[in-house]
Amino acid sequence: ARKLVNSGRLSVPSFLTGSVLNTPDVDAFEGNMVPGAPMDDAPVQVNGQDAWLLNQVGKGFQVMLFADAPPSPEVLAQLASCRSAPPCANEPVQVIPLIVTSSPLNIPGMTVVIDTQGLVAKRYDAQPGTSYLLRPDQHVLARWRSLDSAQLQAALARALGQVGELA
């Protein structure tokens, strides 16, 4: 009898680090989660249930913000402004916030995942305030040590090819 092959185990995600659609780093980071890298998975908790980080992303563009306390009103306003990004081909583009924290936080209207083992923060070289812009295919587009909606909007425009000459 023929053996079945799990083809999913034979594939390796591509690093798209050379793509002009990525936004180069302006802040210092360590590790593999560079713009263009496929996201690393890690165990998390969502609504008190064990889960995996990658199951929480991939529903569109997302901004993953690391926080140890509820975000300030300014940061919440920046996250809200990201929900209504400039349209692409006359279609609205939303950026969905995802908050990663080491302890439970209640932030109305936003998904909060608890990094119970600290592995998400470690793998993403994150500290409170670090933010990542993620593609729908679970690749890193850009990352910063602090969230800035203007930088995030510029990175999204670049990812959508809405800027002049990409270099």
Where are these regions (language model features)?
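Helical substrate-recognition/capping region of FAD-dependent monooxygenase/halogenase enzymes
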Residues: 1-167
